[in-house]
């Protein structure tokens, strides 16, 4: 294009004659081959005014359009924070982000769009995979070599030659060598026989976490000592040195244990771990819905009277089955609603609060309604201002009260006494008394009638066995020894009296030494001095009692 003169471009000016004049009919259009964007039609000897007159003007109403009908973009430009400049929102100048910011699948589509056209021409019809050998790599290389190096040479303006050389197909093959296989096999899509679990998983329906067919069968639940997560290195001293070191349960742990007792969940051990309690807490609403559905089914099965009689103490021992309700209806004509109202008339206010809770509109959790008293205390017991029970604890925390700043909490008196066996309940007391009465009735077969009540009195040691006693005292001793000899055989009666006689009045000697004292014979006639009497007696009590007898 540099060979064109400037006068050529001005209107109404003809080009100057060149060295060789070409006649007008032989003048042809010149095209630069291989450079399509440089194509330019050159008119020789024709002015632009004549050419402008030859163009036919087309006036067609269909070409006109209403610019208001074109929907404008929501905004024409935006402030790009990356470049810090105003960028066009649409059009050719709109900035394209880098490949790392493209959405998923865009890179493969762009790569497929940039792929070169297939080299060569197809000689036959496709066989759809029946003859895979027809698409060998060598065949492609032959076709590529036949078409390689093909170029065209055309003459440009002013006698310049421009050569357009096609890119060799070897470079193209090198680019696509990785993605091409040796041959292509067309396969029909296989029909997938999905199981119920795979179908639920693919469709997004609720399904178990593990395929039930491939899941390993879990054995019997192990105790807390056998579970590996409860293993601890055994210390030399007992860890539970105080009964106050027991971990206080929190709400989630108690609820998880209650759900495990009712069979709604399964825990591996005696007490739920923090993980099991957290999993049960995460599915709290689902578990509650399941429990409410089970309660509704039970209500429909057994009837409302039998269902609500659980919270009416007066109706606990009464037959509330459907047959009994129907029989009562046939006898009295009262329908089920009337009988239900009658039953609720026997319900106390406390039972109504337990049954319905604080608000009759809220469906209460059946698990909380039927919790034992100790579980309720574990959750809702304690001080609401400084909670000691109903908060989440550290599982490895061991409270140590042995420091100077701490002391063991003062226990409640009644549970403490009952725990140590110092206090018993009334029922247990009556049971023990009944057992003792039965034992007495079995052992005592015969008791002689004693008219004198003093005959059965117990000797508390007023008289000494080592002194000469009166006849009345001897008779009293014989009478006292008689009930004791009745318990044994008749042959052992004398031995029992002798053994009883060996134990002297000096009980302190028997307590300290464990041996009975042999009685010392001393005459009452011999008068002892004060020092001798003190030395002769074993202790002060014996001395004083002997001194009183001497007087």
Swiss-Prot record:
Stretches of Polar residues bias are at: 505-516
- Tell me where in or outside the cell this protein is found: Plastid, Chloroplast
GO biological process per UniProt: plastid transcription; positive regulation of DNA-templated transcription; positive regulation of red or far-red light signaling pathway; positive regulation of thermomorphogenesis; protein catabolic process; regulation of plant organ morphogenesis; regulation of transcription by RNA polymerase II; response to blue light
Record organism: Oryza sativa subsp. japonica
Show the PANTHER family listed in the entry.
PROTEIN PLASTID TRANSCRIPTIONALLY ACTIVE 12, CHLOROPLASTIC
**Highest taxon of the source?**
Eukaryota
Q: Where is the transit peptide?
A: 1-47
Q: Which keywords, in A-to-Z order, does the entry hold?
A: Chloroplast, Plastid, Transcription, Transcription regulation, Transit peptide
Keyword field contains Transcription regulation: yes
Region of interest (Disordered), residue spans:
76-161, 463-529
Q: Does the keyword Transcription regulation apply?
A: yes
- Listed Acidic residues bias regions: 467-476, 485-498
Which Gene Ontology CC terms are recorded? chloroplast; nucleus; plastid-encoded plastid RNA polymerase complex
One example GO MF annotation? transcription regulator activator activity
Listed Basic and acidic residues bias regions: 518-529
Where is it predominantly found?
plastid
Question: What InterPro entries does its record include?
Answer: PTAC12 (IPR034581)
Q: Biased composition, Low complexity: where in the chain?
A: 109-119
Assembly information from the UniProt record: Component of the plastid-encoded plastid RNA polymerase (PEP) complex.
Which protein is depicted?
A: Protein PLASTID TRANSCRIPTIONALLY ACTIVE 12, chloroplastic
Functional description taken from the UniProt entry: Required for the activity of the plastid-encoded RNA polymerase (PEP) and full expression of genes transcribed by PEP. Required for the proper build-up and formation of the PEP-complex. Binds single-stranded (ss) DNA and RNA, but not double-stranded (ds) DNA.
